[in-house]
Amino acid sequence: MADNEEDVEAEEEYTELTDISGVGPSKAESLREAGFESVEDVRGADQSALADVSGIGNALAARIKADVGGLEVESETEAEVEEEGGEEAPDEDVETELQARGLTEKTPDLSDEDARLLTQRHRVGKPQFNRQDHHKKKRVSTSWRKPRGQLSKQRRGIKGKGDTVEAGFRSPTAVRGKHPSGFEEVRVHNVDDLEGVDGDTEAVRIASKVGARKRERIEEEAEDAGIRVLNPTYVEVEVSE
């Protein structure tokens, strides 16, 4: 009798999707849009199917299954693990390598003049513009400061004392600020920022504050739209012989 009462209480406890641990109104709406209308639908679904729902992910899907599925799911999982553990598979050395996601080899459509100017910019280069006496005093950093002393040899332009910042060192105007590949960089923080990006002349750089889950969605959308990501995520994959 006590066990039956506990089962009834457990069933009555979850009447709405929002009663499940970790599921708020927004995530409940995402579950409904994916076809999970009730708690019973969630209880009968696989963890992988829940993880594919927008805004859920694998970690929250496991939490939902643990909360809704009860102890029966956990005991079955443990039993399966114990049965599989009896046979020890031989260790195989699998060669892996890191590969970048997305269109890493894509190049922009450049005119002959822009291609020439990019080559010129790379060939000529720029001085480092280090601060005067940075190599003499530890407290002096390398960040550029204009020399102002009357006896400063760097200010007077004496050879070997370091270059000073002047307009003549700037890059050609047509390719100024472009990525070495020739793309114009566009900074993105979410999927919506990809709208309006021209994949033939522009490439995106994902902001450093973007999390792993949102970064993955941005990279997938960029690849589908034919847009190159300049700072892609590297994943470990097996090397095919």
Swiss-Prot record:
Subunit structure: Part of the 50S ribosomal subunit. Interacts weakly with protein L15.
Primary gene name: rpl32e
InterPro entries: DNA_repair_Rad51/TF_NusA_a-hlx (IPR010995), Hlx-hairpin-Hlx_DNA-bd_motif (IPR003583), Ribosomal_eL32 (IPR001515), Ribosomal_eL32_arc (IPR023654), Ribosomal_eL32_CS (IPR018263), Ribosomal_eL32_sf (IPR036351)
Region (Disordered): 1-47, 68-182
Keyword rRNA-binding found: yes
Compositional bias (Acidic residues): 1-16, 73-96
Record-given protein name: Large ribosomal subunit protein eL32
Keywords linked to the UniProt accession: Ribonucleoprotein, Ribosomal protein, RNA-binding, rRNA-binding
Basic and acidic residues bias locations: 29-44, 103-116
One Gene Ontology molecular-function label: nucleotide binding
UniProt GO cellular component terms: cytosolic large ribosomal subunit
Family per record: Belongs to the eukaryotic ribosomal protein eL32 family.
Gene Ontology BP annotations: DNA repair; translation
Gene3D superfamilies recorded: 5' to 3' exonuclease, C-terminal subdomain
NCBIfam families: PRK08562.1, PRK12766.1
SUPFAM superfamilies: Rad51 N-terminal domain-like, Ribosomal protein L32e
Biased segments, Basic residues type: 133-159
Job description of the protein: Binds to the 23S rRNA.
